[in-house]
From Swiss-Prot:
SUPFAM superfamilies: P-loop containing nucleoside triphosphate hydrolases (SSF52540). It comes from African swine fever virus (isolate Tick/Malawi/Lil 20-1/1983) (ASFV). This is Putative helicase/primase complex protein. InterPro entries: P-loop_NTPase, Replication_origin-bd. Belongs to the asfivirus F1055L family. Keywords: DNA replication, Early protein. Gene3D superfamilies: P-loop containing nucleotide triphosphate hydrolases. GO terms for biological process: DNA replication.
């Protein structure tokens, strides 16, 4: 039985469905739209409709189900692919069917992922592909062109109404890749929705909506052919899903925090052996999804799964859990992410259980068999005579002995090649001297003056390569021992004559008849450099896999207290201890701490603070000097080239963090004492989570982007950019140093992002056994911390009370430090004082220890520089343009004269541009805007400007974690981190209002209109921003610490604030010494007083 109507909604003519039926009575009827006859038909039930439909002629079957929004309904998706369009993201696949199917598969996966997050995790409601119904209407359109259309229906579930369906659909659309989003119709959940019925087609088209068994087989979706399963208005047999609009609290918990790219590598390691049957698919919010490659046993369900992508890893807080789509009541804890208190211990457990692959394959291993010699023996085999030989083996297996045999065989007294030129390049002076003792027929560069080219066999350190010259004939043999460290040294910033040194190095590398590279920690950087610059000759890889460290035992912890108390116990038992650390402050702390507790013990202490004379004399005779001591403490000052062979020391205690040198250098430090009686190493690892770009592509993009913005014109309103007509787009010259620099940055960033996992992996890969260091947490740490404060305070006192020197003496001290000449400790403090006074233009003023503590800090200096740069002009936009011009001029000079200056320079324009953009989007006009925003005003701004805004570029620039959620409070927290780093400002909340306020560091360096005598300040040229009359009184009562409110016009004297930012393009000292940076930023200070890229707070590590 049916009734027909011309209209759906009432039009007062009695011809509409609404005229006869109420919404309540329609619940028990089935309504369709007859497109062919332009009518609405109301049936008493679905069965009546199907009987009637079967009797209609094919050309008139143009029926659409009318879905009323207030009624329960199935979740549905309308997918439509336009004709004559390529659907692959990279446009590489010409097979349209495959492209369409690949995209359709991706859409189904995203639907399942959103369902899992929305319903499976909180409510344990599962969705499999067999519960998804897929129909198609593929065929020719009116223009005789092939068109693809699909409907996806979750036929076993229903939602309460169209608003719930709309909310779920929106979540799916948010998580689709941008190139797929347009194919999904977002408007299929209206309050009254027409949805085509199975077996029907559009009027004038022969594309019929139908079941497709072949399609269901491809996508493993439901094989049902039951017509009622395709209807949207649901019968009672479906399961009604919980409401996601009313249960917001349950579905927006912290578990939805997204996984950062830099965290993904750690998360994937927890998959371990699971990846034998699965491969990584993608990340969805806080879920890592996998694609099944073969059947596997599920530890959660305790049975085999042979289809469906069941494996999911979920990250909640710092915990990583394993889930199965078939059972959401249970999960397995896999471990914890780095940057957390127990991550070290958790990760060691994973390594001990062999569920993590510790070996990091390198590109050399992928060379064909004819280009590699791999074996496992306790001593080295003879080296091959090939143009490019690369040797990898652990320490103490005889690499140098076999090299000596190689030289004797091919370059010995009886060899016809004895007159040919050999250059042995090292990365440290002390290593050069060590090598000469083993190769006495070589000339050491430091023992001769003048021309080195006349010597056939020369051992030379990289920073002295300028003493060589290129000739018509290439060198016959170039030896690069510790090759990875040699590449690192070119980024040290210590080269006095960088350009000629690097040019000679590249000339030898490219033209030498034979090259031998040796390193125990060989990596992809060496492979890529050799391929790029010696690609015309094949590489031969000689690898002895023998694990000499298989009897060594490493005990790891993240607890300083446990580590310290183990150390104290061993000292009480009168054991001889070795303590390497990559933190100067930690080394000084340990020295003082041990001296106070064990005054009778003799301590050897070596750092860059040690005098040049002491280092040279002791390192050349460690057998004698280290034989006199009970405890040896050293920083990266001691690395390769210094080796103690005697069995004197019992155990090694290492303390390392990710704020200093890379993992490879730290591991090298462990081997300076070759023989430990106990073969026991106890290591404390600490490191916060960092977010540095870690692929060559990302680093290059980030580097070029910072320079790219220098060529653009700033819009005063929305900080948009266009390219300057005068300068055009920049042209980048990708020189050999550029490629080496990119490779080195990649390694440094990997260490900063994944320091703990890479450290443990590299140790375990040597064959050493790894364990968790256990013990009690006693009160020792309080005394330790107290000593730390004493050391820091004494340093402040020493600087404040040091002699006040002039610029000439400061320059002399600086030159002595660069040239390795011993500088008296008093002069070092005087030089530190001079730099501090010079930085703030504070000469002639008396300073106190408190002044040194506050103003010699990393954050205060960074904020001061930022404030000076942004307040030069009358507006922030004028200031940005001035800074842009200054940095553009430097960049253009550097690209023409000395590229390494450009790559090592810290361009700050882009960081200012982002910071000001964030501030203005919040509704403030500049850094000195005194106005107040109400809570409603700011929240509205944050929603309108940022909820759909991608903050990836900003987080990339400031090395901050991208916000997990884009709600107003999370966005504001992120913005305040940026403003705090750049200017020492924050958007502060008080009594329902928001205004700009100083941070603790920012309050030390106020913006003023005229210089003040009380403290360093920033004389700002920014024109005053007029306060709104309604907020003046509030500002005066709540912002007493903020900006001066004098009415005088800002001084326009640029010379007052142009102190330190003007970087001279001829200065070679752009990079600070990277050695021994403390993990606590207050504890170190760079010698780069000319730049704003100060790394730490306290004293120069030279």
């Amino acid at each position: 039985m049916q009734e027909t109507f011309k209209f759906l909604r009432s039009n007062s003519q009695g011809e509409a469905v609404e005229d006869k039926y109420s919404l309540e009575t329609l619940k028990n009827h089935f309504v369709i739209r007859d497109e062919y006859n332009n009518l609405f038909r109301v049936f008493s039930g679905r069965d009546d409709f199907w009987k009637w439909e079967a009797a209609q002629p094919f050309e008139q079957k143009c029926f659409h189900e009318v879905v009323f929004g207030f009624l329960p309904q199935r979740l549905k998706f309308d997918i439509d692919f336009p004709v004559n369009k390529s659907y692959s993201n990279d446009n590489v696949d010409d097979n349209v069917d495959d492209n369409v199917y690949n995209i359709l598969d991706m859409i189904i996966n995203v639907i399942m992922d959103v369902f899992y997050e929305t319903y499976s995790l909180p409510y344990n409601i599962n969705l499999t592909r067999e519960q998804i119904l897929l129909t198609d209407s593929i065929g020719l359109n009116k223009k005789r062109e092939l068109k693809y259309s699909f409907h996806i229906i979750l036929y076993t579930y229903s939602v309460l109404n169209n608003n719930e369906a709309k909310a779920f659909t929106s979540k799916v659309l948010e998580n689709l890749p941008k190139h797929i989003y347009p194919f999904v119709d977002p408007q299929v959940n209206k309050s009254i929705q027409n949805f085509r019925i199975i077996g029907s087609h559009k009027k004038g088209s022969m594309r019929v909506k139908m079941f497709n068994e072949e399609l269901a087989d491809v996508f493993e979706t439901s094989m049902t052919t039951k017509k009622s399963d395709t209807l949207i208005s649901t019968p009672f047999e479906t399961t009604c899903l919980p409401c996601i609009l009313t249960n917001v609290k349950e579905t927006t918990s912290s578990s939805c925090d997204s996984i950062q790219q830099s965290e993904l590598e750690e998360v994937l390691k927890f998959a371990g052996t699971l990846c034998k049957n699965h491969c990584f698919l993608r990340v969805y919010k806080n879920l890592v999804l996998f694609k099944r490659t073969s059947p596997s046993y599920c530890e959660i369900c305790k049975r085999m799964h042979d289809k469906d992508n069941t494996l999911i890893l979920r990250v909640t807080g710092n915990k990583v859990y394993q889930h199965c789509r078939h059972d959401n009541k249970h999960s397995l804890l896999m471990g914890s992410l780095s940057g957390t208190n127990n991550f070290v211990e958790t990760y060691v457990e994973q390594v001990m259980s062999k569920s993590i692959e510790v070996h990091e394959s390198i590109l050399f291993e992928e060379l064909p068999d004819t280009q590699k010699h791999i074996y496992d023996e306790s001593s080295m085999r003879e080296y091959e005579r090939v143009p490019t030989l690369v040797v990898k083996a652990q320490m103490k297996i005889g690499k140098t002995i076999q090299l000596r045999n190689y030289l004797q065989k091919y370059y010995g007294n009886d060899s016809i090649s004895k007159q040919q030129t050999i250059r042995f390049v090292t990365f440290r002076q002390i290593f050069s001297k060590n090598i000469q003792t083993r190769l006495p027929n070589f000339t050491l560069y430091s023992e001769v003056t003048g021309d080195l080219d006349s010597y056939e066999r020369v051992i030379i350190q990289v920073e002295s390569l300028f003493r060589l010259t290129s000739t018509a004939e290439p060198v016959d043999l170039l030896i690069l021992d510790e090759v990875e460290s040699i590449f690192n040294q070119f980024n040290s910033g210590l080269h006095k004559y960088f350009a000629p040194s690097f040019a000679i190095f590249m000339w030898m590398l490219e033209t030498a008849n034979h090259v031998i590279c040796l390193d125990a920690n060989l990596g992809n950087r060496t492979y890529n450099i050799l391929q790029r610059f010696r690609g015309d000759v094949p590489i031969f890889f000689h690898w002895n896999q023998y694990q000499k460290a298989q009897n060594d035992m490493y005990y790891f912890t993240s607890s300083r207290e446990i580590w310290l108390n183990n150390l104290l116990k061993d000292l009480l038992e009168d054991k001889k201890i070795v303590i390497p650390t990559n933190s100067l402050m930690e080394a000084r702390l340990l020295q003082t701490f041990i001296q106070k507790k064990f005054p009778e013990k003799k301590i050897g202490f070596y750092s860059s603070k040690s005098s040049a004379h002491e280092r040279e004399s002791h390192f050349n005779n460690v057998s004698y000097y280290w034989g006199l001591i009970d405890i040896l403490i050293y920083t990266p000052t001691i690395s390769a080239g210094v080796s103690y062979e005697d069995k004197r020391f019992d155990v090694l205690y290492g303390f390392f963090n990710n704020m200093s040198c890379d993992v490879e250098t730290c591991c090298q430090m462990l081997g300076r004492v070759r023989e430990l009686k106990s073969k026991c190493y106890k290591i404390c690892l600490q490191g916060k989570q960092n977010y540095f770009p870690e692929t060559i592509e990302d680093i290059e993009m980030f580097t070029l982007q910072k320079r790219d913005t220098l060529f653009q014109t700033i819009s005063n309103h929305q900080l948009s950019f266009t390219y300057c007509k005068e300068t055009g787009r920049p042209i980048y010259y990708k020189t050999p140093y550029y490629h080496l620099w990119l490779e080195t940055m990649r390694i440094q960033h990997l260490s900063k992002n994944h320091f703990i996992t890479r450290f443990i992996n590299q140790v375990a890969d040597t064959g050493a056994k790894v364990f968790i260091l256990t013990g009690e947490k006693l009160e020792t740490v309080k005394q330790y911390t107290s000593i730390k404060m004493e050391i820091k305070h004494q340093d402040y006192v020493n600087v404040a009370s040091a002699e006040t020197i002039d610029a000439n003496k400061a320059l002399q001290i600086k030159q002595n430090l660069k040239e390795g000449i011993t500088v008296d400790q008093r002069d070092l403090f005087a030089y530190e004082k001079y730099k501090l006074l010079e930085f703030y233009a504070w000469h002639g003023n008396k300073i106190t220890p408190k002044f040194v503590e506050q103003y010699n800090s990393f954050m205060t200096k960074q904020n001061y520089t930022g404030r000076v740069q942004i307040s030069r002009g009358k507006t922030v936009y004028e200031s940005l343009t001035m800074l842009q011009t200054q940095e553009l001029n430097f960049h253009q000079w550097a690209m023409q004269h000395a590229e390494h200056h450009d790559l090592q320079f810290n361009y700050s324009f882009q960081s200012h541009m982002y910071a000001i953009m964030l501030l203005t989007k919040c509704g403030f006009k500049c850094v000195q805007d005194p106005n107040i925003l109400t809570n409603e005003q700011l929240m509205t701004k944050l929603v309108d400007e940022f909820v759909q805004y991608d903050l990836s570029a900003v987080s990339f620039e400031f090395k901050l974690k991208k916000p997990n959620k884009m709600d107003p409070q999370t966005i504001l927290k992120f913005i305040n981190k940026v403003l705090g780093l750049r200017y020492g400002l924050k958007i502060h909340h008080n009594k329902g209002n928001y205004y700009i306020k100083n941070t603790k560091a920012g309050s030390l360096i106020p913006f003023v209109r005229q210089p003040i005598k009380q403290s360093p300040c920033v004389v700002s040229n920014l024109l005053p921003i007029t306060e709104s009359s309604s907020t003046k009184e509030e500002i005066s009562s709540t912002k007493e610490e903020t900006y001066s409110t004098k009415e005088e016009t800002y001084s326009t004297k640029e010379e007052t604030c142009s102190i330190k930012e003007e970087i001279s393009p001829i200065k070679e000292e752009t990079c600070s010494i990277k050695e021994e940076i403390s993990p606590i930023k207050e504890e170190t200070c760079s010698i780069k007083e000319e730049t704003s890229s100060i790394k730490e707070e306290t004293f120069t590590e030279t």
